[in-house]
Protein backbone atom coordinates (compact mmCIF):
# COMPACT_ATOMS: atom_id res chain seq x y z
CA UNK A 1 0.00 0.00 0.00
CA UNK A 2 3.01 2.31 0.32
CA UNK A 3 4.86 4.12 -2.42
CA UNK A 4 6.42 1.73 -4.91
CA UNK A 5 9.72 2.19 -6.73
CA UNK A 6 7.84 2.93 -9.97
CA UNK A 7 5.95 5.79 -8.37
CA UNK A 8 9.20 7.25 -7.04
CA UNK A 9 10.82 6.99 -10.48
CA UNK A 10 7.86 8.77 -12.09
CA UNK A 11 8.01 11.58 -9.53
CA UNK A 12 11.79 11.86 -10.05
CA UNK A 13 11.29 12.04 -13.82
CA UNK A 14 8.70 14.80 -13.48
CA UNK A 15 10.98 16.78 -11.15
CA UNK A 16 13.87 16.48 -13.62
CA UNK A 17 11.62 17.63 -16.47
CA UNK A 18 10.34 20.62 -14.48
CA UNK A 19 13.61 21.88 -13.06
CA UNK A 20 16.28 20.43 -15.32
CA UNK A 21 19.46 18.72 -14.23
CA UNK A 22 21.54 21.91 -13.95
CA UNK A 23 19.14 23.55 -11.52
CA UNK A 24 18.84 20.34 -9.48
CA UNK A 25 22.65 20.14 -9.32
CA UNK A 26 22.80 23.73 -8.02
CA UNK A 27 20.12 23.01 -5.44
CA UNK A 28 22.01 19.90 -4.33
CA UNK A 29 25.30 21.75 -3.96
CA UNK A 30 23.59 24.57 -2.04
CA UNK A 31 21.95 22.07 0.27
CA UNK A 32 25.28 20.27 0.77
CA UNK A 33 27.01 23.55 1.60
CA UNK A 34 24.33 24.41 4.13
CA UNK A 35 24.68 21.02 5.81
CA UNK A 36 28.49 21.37 5.92
CA UNK A 37 28.15 24.84 7.44
CA UNK A 38 25.73 23.53 10.06
CA UNK A 39 28.03 20.64 10.99
CA UNK A 40 31.01 23.00 11.22
CA UNK A 41 29.17 25.39 13.51
CA UNK A 42 28.05 22.49 15.71
CA UNK A 43 31.61 21.16 16.02
CA UNK A 44 32.92 24.68 16.73
CA UNK A 45 30.33 25.03 19.50
CA UNK A 46 31.37 21.68 21.01
CA UNK A 47 35.05 22.73 20.95
CA UNK A 48 34.16 26.04 22.58
CA UNK A 49 32.26 24.24 25.34
CA UNK A 50 35.13 21.79 25.83
CA UNK A 51 37.58 24.68 26.24
CA UNK A 52 35.25 26.55 28.58
CA UNK A 53 34.62 23.68 31.02
CA UNK A 54 38.23 23.41 32.29
CA UNK A 55 38.31 27.19 32.77
CA UNK A 56 35.12 27.07 34.83
CA UNK A 57 36.56 24.25 36.95
CA UNK A 58 39.80 26.18 37.45
CA UNK A 59 37.88 29.31 38.45
CA UNK A 60 35.80 27.31 40.93
CA UNK A 61 38.96 25.84 42.49
CA UNK A 62 40.56 29.28 42.78
CA UNK A 63 37.41 30.66 44.34
CA UNK A 64 37.30 27.81 46.87
CA UNK A 65 40.95 28.41 47.77
CA UNK A 66 40.28 32.14 48.18
CA UNK A 67 37.39 31.38 50.53
CA UNK A 68 39.53 28.98 52.59
CA UNK A 69 42.32 31.52 53.20
CA UNK A 70 40.21 33.94 55.32
CA UNK A 71 39.00 31.00 57.42
CA UNK A 72 42.60 29.98 58.16
CA UNK A 73 43.44 33.52 59.31
CA UNK A 74 40.43 33.60 61.65
CA UNK A 75 41.20 30.22 63.24
From Swiss-Prot:
Record-level GO BP terms: protein transport by the Tat complex
Pfam families for the chain: TatA_B_E
Composition-biased stretches (Low complexity): 56-65
Localization: Cell inner membrane
Keyword field contains Magnesium: no
Record region (Disordered): 41-75
Membrane topology: Single-pass membrane protein
Keywords tagged on the record: Cell inner membrane, Cell membrane, Membrane, Protein transport, Translocation, Transmembrane, Transmembrane helix, Transport
Membrane-crossing segments per the record: 1-21
A GO CC term attached to the entry: TAT protein transport complex
MF GO annotations: protein transmembrane transporter activity
Compositionally biased intervals (Basic and acidic residues): 66-75
First and last residue of the signal peptide: none
Subunit comment: The Tat system comprises two distinct complexes: a TatABC complex, containing multiple copies of TatA, TatB and TatC subunits, and a separate TatA complex, containing only TatA subunits. Substrates initially bind to the TatABC complex, which probably triggers association of the separate TatA complex to form the active translocon.
Family to which this protein belongs: Belongs to the TatA/E family.
Role according to the record: Part of the twin-arginine translocation (Tat) system that transports large folded proteins containing a characteristic twin-arginine motif in their signal peptide across membranes. TatA could form the protein-conducting channel of the Tat system.
Record protein name field: Sec-independent protein translocase protein TatA
Amino acid sequence: MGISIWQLLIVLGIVILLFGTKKLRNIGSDLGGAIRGFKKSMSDEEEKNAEQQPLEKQNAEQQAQAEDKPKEKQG
